[in-house]
Amino acid sequence: MQILSRCQGLMSEECGRTTALAAGRTRKGAGEEGLVSPEGAGDEDSCSSSAPLSPSSSPRSMASGSGCPPGKCVCNSCGLEIVDKYLLKVNDLCWHVRCLSCSVCRTSLGRHTSCYIKDKDIFCKLDYFRRYGTRCSRCGRHIHSTDWVRRAKGNVYHLACFACFSCKRQLSTGEEFALVEEKVLCRVHYDCMLDNLKREVENGNGISVEGALLTEQDVNHPKPAKRARTSFTADQLQVMQAQFAQDNNPDAQTLQKLAERTGLSRRVIQVWFQNCRARHKKHVSPNHSSSTPVTAVPPSRLSPPMLEEMAYSAYVPQDGTMLTALHSYMDAHSPTTLGLQPLLPHSMTQLPISHT
């Protein structure tokens, strides 16, 4: 586990520790043209700078002092003497123009301005960086010489890839960070990880560092905390039930008085009354809650159209005896006589009236 460090921005160095020499060319039999010898490789990946020798230096003397046998040049690839007009020279070894090729893709390097050599193997630029190039520890892509990078405990990152594993925030230069199991954490989420580990250890639960790390989903959508259930004492229930019997929907002042008497908050008492009203409404019979007594209408206020409706009502009650009594009563009294009655009988006031 890497203790908190500070970010630093660095330029990438691709081939500073590898041997990468330019292929020199010479024309045999032309003393006035000097052999081109490569310079040492620098920090850049091209490494293709070269400088011509003076005309006094002959190709044969250069070849003899560079690994070729005196009097002839032997190709390092095929082992045959080089009698061509041109030859290639890499790392003090001579090559036919057609024989110098990449050891991976076998691409001819005769027309390339540079090549790379490592452990006596020749590589083109593409295959060299595929095999030995520096990769970002976060995204796995290659890091080029022009890229800005950050280094942490031997790991190299692109600037955009050097971000917190939990919140995905890119870290700035000088900001504290931690490297935990190859994962970069900002200071805030590093402390959160330590708190999670400490809490699980205190609870006796085993947890790994991977499990203690917060993911982006946990940061953006944290799990809601479980709501603690409220328990009431017998005295508190007695006070609230007595109030509910008097008024099942108390106002704010009554709620405040109940809160002072019970020691509960107004919100808790209000929720308790809401739940009680819902239960009461659910268990009360619909017939009892919706039934209203039918009041008798004074005959003086009954208009003739209403008498006609009452006389010819199409109401059919469930009880057949009531229907028979109604017909017998209507046969015995005319509508005019019915309108002059001072009061309707009590039994008739209970009959429902319907309109057609």
Curated annotation (Swiss-Prot):
Residues 73-133, 134-196 form the LIM zinc-binding domain. Residues 23-63 are annotated as: Disordered. Keywords: DNA-binding, Homeobox, LIM domain, Metal-binding, Nucleus, Repeat, Transcription, Transcription regulation, Zinc. It holds the Pfam family LIM. Its main location: nucleus. Residues 225-284 bind DNA. Residues 47-63 have a biased composition (Low complexity). Transcription factor involved in differentiation of certain neurons and mesenchymal cells. GO terms for molecular function: DNA-binding transcription factor activity, RNA polymerase II-specific; metal ion binding; RNA polymerase II transcription regulatory region sequence-specific DNA binding; sequence-specific double-stranded DNA binding. One of its GO terms (cellular component) is nucleus. SUPFAM superfamilies: Glucocorticoid receptor-like (DNA-binding domain), Homeodomain-like. This is LIM/homeobox protein Lhx8. It comes from the Eukaryota. It is found in: Nucleus. GO terms for biological process: forebrain neuron development; neuron differentiation; regulation of transcription by RNA polymerase II.
